Amino acid sequence: MRIDRYISKSRVIDIESTDFESAVSELLSVCDVTKERGITKKGLLADLLDREKQMTTYLGNGVCLPHARIKMKRPYMVAVGRCPKGLVYDGQPEYEGIRFIFLLLASKNARNYLFSLASLARVFQDNGHMDRLRAAIKITDFRKELKQVFAGEENKPRRRHNRFNNLILREAAKIAKGAQCTSVLV
């Protein structure tokens, strides 16, 4: 899944807060969730913090991935924050190691929610990708690296079969059939 499609430059920020709750609140402030009916920033923050108390979203490698399913029109919304000094939350020491918070908001109708979480987790496990993100000093460089890291291999242009390619393939198949070949190498 191409997560980079859901990352907007305006939702990639440097977090100024030092505690987890305020950091998530900063990320929510750059998300346009107030346009959706029945969703308040305060209620969404409470849901995210409740989920965090039940089970941590800290994945290791300096990454925290709070996520929630909400009623919204778009399938996904991703906000990313850098925390160079780590965060404080309920006295838990692992939060001090957090350097990135990826907030994933998914529509209740989104089909590939678990697949999206898995795609994000795969990137976070790759030390090469994480080193590229850590190496970006300016926020503009970080945004660029973020897009490249999440675009992955799918960022390469796809090869399309055009009429000419199809014509050559059909003619090659005819020649191969006439020569009693069992396969065609193009």
Residue ranges and their predicted role:
Residues 1-186:
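Cytosolic covalent-transfer regions centered on His/Cys nucleophiles
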